[in-house]
Amino acid sequence: MSWIIFYTVIAALLILDLRIIHKNNTIMSFKESVLFSLFYLVIACLFGIYVYYNTGADHAREYYTCFLIEKAMSLDNIFVISIIFQFFKIPWQYQHRVLFFGIIGVIIFRAVMIYGGIILINKFAWLLYIFAVILIATGIKTFYVSHKTFDIQNSYIYKSIIKNLNITPNLEGNKFIVKRNNKLYCTPLFISLVLIEAIDLVFAIDSIPAIFAITNDVYIIYTSNIFAILGLRALFFCLAEIVERFSYIKYSLALILIFISFKIFIHHYIAIPEYVAFTVTMTLLLFGIIASIIRKNMIDH
């Protein structure tokens, strides 16, 4: 029943998005972007309340902790998506179409990765320690790298697409694939969609291990992941303002990843309660937000 409720909510949100909010491919303003981002955030929080009443406080804390971590780590996806759209010169009115179908792929691929990861961890418990090392490396790198980049022209995926598929030189409206002379051609819109899906899989290698350190409950991991990613599409359209206002969140995220790694290494000796993990995650993110706001105000004055 819980899965039915989850997928019903997701389906309703996607239908609302495609058929009502973006029915005419209109460009989303900054104000609309912020409002819809808050709307998705409220829905995610309400679902957390449902988890609380359905499975208890511990699972609810796990859900919110996983949601916050995935939300923070997914911000880098926005940078790379922006690079991809700029590279292929995708107009604003078509970007939402790519992002919409991108989320469909994410729903499928994240399920495969999460289920596969849980099976591997249950069979090979030592994999968690490898994940911990990955998280430490990611956390340290986050301190020194402003944001993740993506060299499109030299990427294996882009080269493979160009080599093996027929590509149209220009956009064909909002179409992903067109037919010419009895041959199918992929448009730049389709290539950008494939690259965005591929990048999400790469970034998931960083974020999903962090979630596995919080819980191995498939329902909690998957639902928190999808709700966190859903709001990113709206968040994309106010990217510049977010980056400017909350520049210190990346340092909070780095500390969270290192804390989670520490939690993995000591869990056989000291079990850190989920409310502690949730409190640490919330506190570090709040410090990052507050520090960013203070810095912005100091610069403005």
Curated annotation (Swiss-Prot):
Upper taxonomic lineage: Bacteria, Pseudomonadati, Pseudomonadota, Alphaproteobacteria, Rickettsiales
Membrane disposition: Multi-pass membrane protein
Tagged with keyword Cell membrane: yes
Record-annotated membrane-spanning stretches: 1-21, 33-53, 72-92, 101-121, 124-144, 194-214, 220-240, 253-273, 274-294
Signal sequence extent: none
Main location as per UniProt: membrane
Source domain of life: Bacteria
Species the sequence originates in: Rickettsia conorii (strain ATCC VR-613 / Malish 7)
The name this protein goes by in its record: Uncharacterized membrane protein RC1219
Keywords carried by this UniProt record: Cell membrane, Membrane, Transmembrane, Transmembrane helix
Subcellular location: Cell membrane
Family (UniProt): Belongs to the TerC family.
Ion transport among keywords: no
Gene Ontology terms: cellular component: plasma membrane
InterPro entries in the record: Integral_membrane_TerC, Integral_membrane_TerC_rswitch
